[in-house]
């Protein structure tokens, strides 16, 4: 009888853990799937410079214009869903933000939308800068580009 109670309790405990991993957050963004790959800034930089890949910075336009990883294109997290049709599902997609949190959310969105090869840059732009990897900046909105 005690064994039956222990087995029943274990089913409830482990069943609750499994559901928590698949629930969506309060914002409707899915929790990150376990199959999203993390990649170091150095490895991401090598990959995006050598082969066709999509490198997306999901920060706000203001954050992006103040300095971003070289070759990264700005698609803010809050507009990503609307722009999924501009991305190639079967090509690698590297995602970066400031510290890695928003890019993890973006990775979850892409995986849910059927993207096959989604990679999150560990530590985001902060780690990219710490590793002294190439950065680019944009002039302030409305300012002419530097010559």
Where are these regions (language model features)?
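Structural scaffold elements adjacent to functional motifs in cytosolic proteins
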Residues: 55-57
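Short, surface-exposed ligand- or partner-binding patches at beta-edge/loop junctions that are enriched
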Residues: 96
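Rhodanese-like catalytic fold shared by cysteine-dependent sulfurtransferases
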Residues: 2-6, 12-50, 62-91, 103-147
């Amino acid at each position: 009888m005690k064994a039956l109670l222990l087995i029943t309790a274990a089913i409830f405990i482990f069943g609750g853990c499994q559901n928590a991993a698949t629930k969506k957050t309060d914002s409707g963004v899915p929790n990150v799937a376990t199959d999203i790959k993390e990649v170091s800034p150095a490895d991401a930089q090598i990959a995006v410079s050598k082969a066709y890949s999509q490198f997306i910075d999901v920060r706000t336009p203001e954050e992006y214009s103040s300095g971003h990883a070289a070759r990264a294109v700005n698609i803010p997290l809050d507009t990503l869903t609307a722009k999924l049709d501009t991305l190639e599902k079967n090509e690698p997609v590297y995602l970066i933000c400031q510290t890695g949190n928003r890019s993890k959310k973006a990775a979850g969105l892409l995986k849910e939308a059927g993207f096959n090869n989604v990679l999150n840059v560990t530590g985001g732009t902060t780690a990219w800068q710490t590793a002294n990897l190439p950065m680019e900046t944009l002039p302030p909105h409305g300012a002419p580009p530097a010559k």
